[in-house]
Regions:
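A structural signal for small-residue-enriched, beta-sheet-centric alpha/beta enzyme cores
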Residues: 1-75, 79-93, 99-407
Length: 407
């Protein structure tokens, strides 16, 4: 496996574009297109929130139908959530506009939206934007990067990655882009991720690969405990690498899923670290657990604790908050057996041993917790299973961003 430059246009046959449609934002791009030169099989995972945005419902329908997909249209600024039949109709209007502009079937157009909930999309601006995107689409790495920028809302930076693998002597590429900064919580978190590959793989196998990996990547991040109405991860495969078909359970499948995991974990961590107002990526490793489920519950509980997140913001080794979060998680463990460590680029320090504080240096702990990426390692000494969750610190900036988000 090799990391390469680019994102959604790194794989063969994919083009992208961005444009400023003026949907909410002024003087910046707010629409993006991903286009495949040939039809793709598609897989998707979506929010578990009962309140689902219109694009989520549309995409679920398209993915379930088995239709070959050739384009994805995404807008930022307005989420098209809680907009009723009118909002769902705008998804169809978007697909129809893309079909007309690109000469493809509307049944194979996926859509995505992110932004303010409850507002109707200005559909005339959206369809005009689709026509512009169709004219501007290119296969360059730069067009992929600009597409990643166009889907940002409160994000501070674009998020993209691409890797290459070998499958039976053929080079297969996987590339992705994502957005997400707030309303991020495990269970498909407002986050959107779009992944493209030129692999030859069936729709069923592609869906298994995505579904199996989401639990260990996007579902292990949290910024604020709010599960969005719009969470969507879409994975397209156009087969242009001309590799021998990747079969579920084969060695090639293992290679493919390892590469997919690299993409998903990278994007998930970038979302977590770019949380609204955040100054640090906060990683939590639960180790020495008796089951994977126990490890995930403990890691998630710590990373979601607002008191712990504010301690990280203050570079304060307030370990009692972590032990407390473990205690109310629902997982069973012996608190008098827990060891806790903090780690960053500045070093590693043990804070508690067997549930009580060791004689550590507060100054050294503060130095370690002052880095832009900080890890807490909780060892319950019950087994060999581990899990990792990602979040961020909680600062005044989060309140400032969200107090006036609609304006």
């Amino acid at each position: 496996m090799k990391q390469i430059a680019g994102g959604v246009t790194a794989a063969k046959g994919y083009e992208a574009a961005s444009t400023a449609a003026g949907i909410k934002y002024q003087n910046r791009t707010d629409m993006a297109m991903i286009y495949s030169q040939v039809p793709c099989v598609a897989a998707g995972t979506f929010t578990t929130n009962v309140v689902k945005a219109a694009p989520v419902k549309w995409d679920q329908q398209v993915v379930k139908s088995g239709a070959k997909v050739q384009a994805v249209i995404v807008n930022s600024g307005i989420a098209n959530a809680c907009t009723g039949s009118e909002g769902f109709g705008y998804c169809k209007d978007t697909a129809d506009a893309a079909a007309a502009a690109l000469g493809i079937s509307a049944a194979g157009v996926l859509v995505g939206s992110t932004g303010v909930i409850g507002k109707q999309i200005p559909i005339e601006k959206l369809t005009a934007g689709v026509a512009e995107l169709a004219k501007k689409k290119q296969a360059t790495l730069e067009s992929g990067q600009e597409a990643a920028k166009a889907i940002m809302t409160t994000d501070t930076k674009e998020k993209e990655l691409a890797v290459e693998i070998e499958v039976a002597g053929k080079t297969v590429t996987i590339g992705g882009m994502a957005k997400g900064s707030g309303m991020i919580h495990p269970n498909m978190c407002t986050m959107l991720a779009f992944i493209t590959t030129d692999a030859v793989i069936s729709k069923e196998t592609l869906q298994k690969a995505l579904s199996e990996d989401v639990d260990d990547t996007y579902n292990m991040i949290s910024v604020d405990g709010d599960t969005s109405t719009n969470d969507t991860v879409l994975l397209l495969a156009n087969g242009m690498a001309e590799n021998e078909e990747i079969i579920y359970g084969s060695e090639a499948y293992e290679t493919f899923t390892e590469a997919l995991h690299v993409i998903n974990e990278y994007l998930a961590k970038k979302i977590a670290g770019d949380g609204e107002g955040a100054t640090a990526l906060f990683e939590v490793k639960a180790v020495g657990c008796e089951s994977k489920e126990q490890a995930k519950i403990l890691a998630k509980s710590i990373v979601c604790s607002n008191l712990t997140k504010t301690a990280i913001a203050g570079h304060d080794a307030n370990w009692g908050r972590i032990l407390c979060a473990m205690g109310y998680s629902g997982a069973q463990f012996d608190p008098e057996q827990v060891d806790l460590f903090f780690e960053s680029a500045a070093g590693k320090i043990q804070i508690i041993e067997n549930g009580t504080a060791v004689n550590y240096s507060e100054a050294e702990a503060t130095k370690i917790l002052s880095e832009p990426e900080v890890t807490a390692i909780a060892d319950v000494k019950m087994g060999e299973e581990t899990a990792t969750a990602w979040g961020c610190d909680l600062t005044h900036g989060y309140i400032e961003i969200n107090a006036d988000y609609r304006s």
